[in-house]
């Protein structure tokens, strides 16, 4: 900010004329401009002074800036609020959105140099609103302000993708209520798979845009000239009057920020005759990884050329999984591998999400409170399970004996009694009552 203000002082002095300082600055440059042959005596003097006086040039520069700012802000006359108002106004004028500086200065003077009155009289006629950027990623698209950080744009669109992925995966299959599809899993959610952990409690940036199912490797950002959005069939960058391509960022360049997002709590498919696990995880985003990305934490689900879903079968049991990360997490249970260890109590877990849930217990925090009885819980899913006591809801139904349960842990405990007598025709997903 200091550099921007310095530029203003050198090129366009503000209302409090800094003639003396600018004159001093011009005089200091005069000898260097007037002498054209060789290195001037003044230049040699400045160079020697810089080399021999232990950063005296830096001190002189700081002192000069101090005099300029002191003369402009006049702290002996102005209060802190007035000084802040001057800085805010100057930054507003050099921020790039002000299109009529003369009008803004006139309104500033007419307001008595009072920021509150100035803001009341200020209209949008004197500024250029931020341009809109049309972003298309993984079949999702939305308009964002050009001032919005790219990281926030990716987070919004990734959440939008994840909000649609569970709905598409669950079409035509009975599923449990959405009360158990959140990131904050409780101690009762012991059967969730790891490797793809994410919060599914998200809000779509633009609910009018549907997922077109295109597996796009890159993030396409198209500049919009504050005009209407393009057709929903895709993003068109052929018309220079409506939009222009501003940037192309590959998904691989963003993998550091995206791979850190976690996925949880979406039902998974099982093989015929197997007991279902309604709280298995599912990837939040459909980012297409390159074939040589061996360090990916979750292999993206993809369809074949004929739309056939690829599946992964466990070699030790008949269970089948949609995603490789689910299979790997499941195989750790067969081997009883618990690589994720709590540093405080040394308890091991099959998946990182279970460890994160467990670590909340050590903090002693219980941020989730029941609205009916004021009882507090450390995890949101525990609160939801508790609330079912008040509502009487039992969303987990046994497909064999039609017995309903409030908690998934009780449901799974009951299902183990049927595990050895499961008929092949029984559906793999429990019905939610």
From Swiss-Prot:
One GO CC annotation: chromosome, telomeric region
Keywords: Chromosome, DNA-binding, Metal-binding, Nucleus, Repeat, Telomere, Transcription, Transcription regulation, Zinc, Zinc-finger
Regions annotated as coiled coil: none
Stretch forming the signal peptide: none
Chief place where the protein resides: nucleus
Transmembrane feature ranges: none
Domain SCAN box: 44-126
Keyword Phosphoprotein: no
A Pfam entry, by short name: SCAN
Cross-referenced PANTHER family: KRUEPPEL-LIKE TRANSCRIPTION FACTOR, ZINC FINGER PROTEIN 384
Protein name in UniProt: Zinc finger and SCAN domain-containing protein 4
Taxonomic placement: Eukaryota, Metazoa, Chordata, Craniata, Vertebrata
Gene that this sequence comes from: ZSCAN4
